[in-house]
Amino acid sequence: MAMANRQNRGAKLPPEVNRILYIKNLPYKITTEEMYEIFGKFGAVRQIRVGNTAETRGTAFVVYEDIFDAKTACEHLSGYNVSNRYLVVLYYQATKAWKRMDTEKARTKLEDIKERYGIGGDIDKEKEKLGLFTPRRI
């Protein structure tokens, strides 16, 4: 496969293609060694990070030395069966990850501010507490 990749070096790749792959639907007990065994068949792997927290379990990042090896691995391993689980292999998109992280950070900050200043809940009760409640006309 490496020979086929070398022949395609002059080919232009789509913008979403990069050296970092994001893998989903992994078996929870998969090891880094098993990941190197699977993904190493398509080229030199620089790094593999397997998720181990509740949010990241079943996912991993694989970083290839060469972008063409990453492209080949993505094409061949999407849908690959590992322990009766079909892998979802995508190109890592940093902008999506940052947007998600920024949103979560902003939500947490907003909740902290609401808690600190006692904001939130029923608006009429808040007005009544502050003496801003006016009786309705009949």
From Swiss-Prot:
Entry's localization field: Nucleus
A molecular-function term among this protein's GO annotations: RNA binding
An annotated GO cellular component: nucleus
Function as written in the Swiss-Prot or TrEMBL entry: Necessary for the splicing of pre-mRNA.
Xref: Gene3D superfamilies: 3.30.70.330
A single GO BP: RNA splicing
Pfam families with a match to the protein in the record: RRM_1 (PF00076)
Gene: sftb-6
InterPro entries found in the cross-reference section: Nucleotide-bd_a/b_plait_sf, RBD_domain_sf, RRM_dom, RRT5_SRSF_SR, SF3B6_RRM
Lineage: Eukaryota, Metazoa, Ecdysozoa, Nematoda, Chromadorea
Region (Interaction with pre-mRNA branch site): 16-29
Keyword RNA-binding: yes
Residue ranges occupied by any RRM domain in the UniProt entry: 19-94
Protein name in the entry: Splicing factor 3B subunit 6-like protein
Keywords per UniProt: mRNA processing, mRNA splicing, Nucleus, RNA-binding
